[in-house]
Amino acid sequence: MSTSRGLGTDFDRWLGKLFRKGPFTALIVLVKITEPKVEPLRSTFVHVVGNKIDWGDIVLMLRGAGVNWDGAAFFPTRDGDGGLVPDELARGRLRELETALREDRLVLNKGAFFDVWGRNLKVEEA
């Protein structure tokens, strides 16, 4: 059951705008924020085939990661035809993203980065 339906979080607005172009695959990175550090915890990908999901649904899904997280970054990606990315390609893109994040946490700003309440976040240089 959704917990934020109708609240209109930054995430909900982002998803609605992005989905107007059709289904996509989202690379997701969960992070722990302990000022001044941002540490990646877990990553995954999901295929977004509809916009009936909201931030509350996402939070419920991300509970399955088994970690307490402070932020979630979403990196939408599409195949060459503008649709869903095959699983194997999504896994490869996720590994590339993980490598880039190990080198530079500011990469999080290239995605859509949200706190636990679905509000926009941004990583600042220390």
Predicted regions: what they are:
Residues 29-36, 75-80, 116-117:
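Short, flexible beta-strand-to-coil junctions
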